[in-house]
Amino acid sequence: MISSTTNIILAFMFSLLGTFMFRSHLMSTLLCLEGMMLSLFILTAFSSLSSQSMIMYSLPIVILVFAACEAAIGLALLAMISSTYGTDYVQNLNLLQC
C-alpha cells in the first residue's frame, strides 16, 4: 500500500510539473490538470477505504464531480479560444482585451 501511495503522489507531482512546463498550450495544461484530478481521486479512494469513517466514503464522489465540472469548463474555454483565435497557444492571447 505504501508503494502504491508513493506512485500516486509521484503521478500528482509529475502532473503538477507538466502543468508548469507546458502552460503555453491550453490543451496540455488541461491534460495535466486531469492527471492531477485522477491521482487525487485514486488517493482519496485509497484513504477512504483504509479509514473506517463514513464521511470519507463520499469524498471520492465529490472529487469526481469537481473533476467533471473542471473538464467541462476547460473544454468550453478551449473551444471558445480555438474558434476565436484559431490556436490554443496561450502566449498569443492578451487577456486584457477579452
UniProtKB/Swiss-Prot annotation:
The listed locations are: Mitochondrion inner membrane
Does the entry feature the keyword Transport, yes or no? yes
Q: What is its EC number?
A: 7.1.1.2
The superkingdom listed in its UniProt entry is Eukaryota
Q: Which GO terms describe its biological process?
A: ATP synthesis coupled electron transport
Q: How does it sit in the membrane?
A: Multi-pass membrane protein
Q: Which Gene3D superfamilies match?
A: 1.10.287.3510
InterPro entries reported for this sequence: NADH_UbQ_OxRdtase_chain4L/K (IPR001133), NUOK/Mnh_C1-like (IPR039428)
Q: Name the major location.
A: mitochondrion
Which top EC class applies here?
translocase
Q: Name one Pfam family in it.
A: Oxidored_q2
What keywords sit in the KW lines? Electron transport, Membrane, Mitochondrion, Mitochondrion inner membrane, NAD, Respiratory chain, Translocase, Transmembrane, Transmembrane helix, Transport, Ubiquinone
Q: Which GO terms describe its cellular component?
A: mitochondrial inner membrane; respiratory chain complex I
Q: Name one GO molecular function term.
A: NADH dehydrogenase (ubiquinone) activity
Query: How is this protein organized at the quaternary level?
Result: Core subunit of respiratory chain NADH dehydrogenase (Complex I) which is composed of 45 different subunits.
According to its UniProt entry, the function of this protein is described as: Core subunit of the mitochondrial membrane respiratory chain NADH dehydrogenase (Complex I) which catalyzes electron transfer from NADH through the respiratory chain, using ubiquinone as an electron acceptor. Part of the enzyme membrane arm which is embedded in the lipid bilayer and involved in proton translocation.
Query: Which PANTHER family would you find in this protein's record?
Result: NADH-UBIQUINONE OXIDOREDUCTASE CHAIN 4L, NADH-UBIQUINONE OXIDOREDUCTASE SUBUNIT ND4L
| Name assigned to this protein | NADH-ubiquinone oxidoreductase chain 4L
Lineage start: Eukaryota, Metazoa, Chordata, Craniata, Vertebrata
Q: Which gene encodes it?
A: MT-ND4L
